Regions:
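Glycine-rich, pocket-lining loop/helix-strand segments that form or immediately flank
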Residues: 104
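DNA polymerase processivity clamps
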Residues: 1-42, 49-101, 116-233
Length: 233
């Protein structure tokens, strides 16, 4: 849960809300949300029991420490409890207490449109490996976008930098319009790495609107804003 959302909190404390994650409990559902202004990560988890409604903002630094302690134990059971101003995480013989971030979290519901003009279903590993290869051509600190050209039956991924260029195609299933769109490759990689499904669905409206990566049950939703780009020859 933490590993699947922590990467999209803000790197600095300029906006304290972006430096934490929203934990929203309603009945037997826990929604965890993080965002940094360029992307939103959402995980919906079904709980064993039902609880009263509650919204709290947990500091990202606390969650990062917990993630380090838990390590690769993805099935580790964590008990979470709240006081008025604090959150308590208990797992194994470890107890972590942290002060909550005060304030009201961002209202993101209006950003989560279910409308789309293009839907792509693609093998997650093929897409992730292709984008990983593209990043080898990007110098550290360079903000080169990866350009994705979606057409019937194929997704073309291009990148061009001072180091070199890449142009690869992946077989896909597509519904709707063709599309040419650019992204920060790191944002796509971060989301794809924590999705366990073999096939992933990507939803697009147009080249200026966010991409949504989500499953049918919406147990995960990743919103990623596109970037402007110059056409790659």
């Amino acid at each position: 849960m933490i590993r699947q959302t922590i990467f999209s909190i803000a790197d600095n404390d300029t906006n304290k809300m972006m430096s934490g994650e929203l934990f929203e409990i309603h009945d037997n559902l826990l929604k965890v949300v993080s965002l940094d202004g360029h992307r939103i990560s959402i995980r919906n988890i079904e709980l064993k029991n039902s609880y009263g409604s509650r919204k709290v903002i947990v500091p990202g630094k606390t969650l990062q420490e917990i993630s380090k302690i838990i390590g690769g134990e993805s099935e580790a059971e964590v008990e979470i409890s709240f006081t008025q101003n604090h959150v308590v995480f208990e797992f194994g013989n470890t107890l972590v207490v942290s002060r909550l971030i005060e304030g009201e979290y961002f209202r993101i519901d209006q950003m989560l449109s279910s409308d789309y003009e293009t839907k792509v279903t693609v093998n997650k590993r093929e897409l992730l490996d292709c984008i990983d290869r593209a990043t080898l051509l990007i110098k550290e600190g360079d903000k080169k976008p990866i350009i994705i050209n979606i057409a019937d039956g194929s997704m073309e991924l291009k990148i061009k930098s001072q180091i070199g260029s890449m142009d690869e195609e992946i077989i896909i299933s597509k519904e709707g319009r063709d599309l040419l769109i650019g992204f920060n490759p790191k944002f796509l990689i971060d989301a794809l790495r924590v999705i366990e499904d073999e096939q992933v669905d990507l939803y697009f409206m147009n080249a200026k609107a966010p991409c949504f990566i989500k499953d049918e049950q919406q147990s995960y939703i990743y919103l990623i804003l596109p970037v402007n780009f110059n056409a790659v020859a």
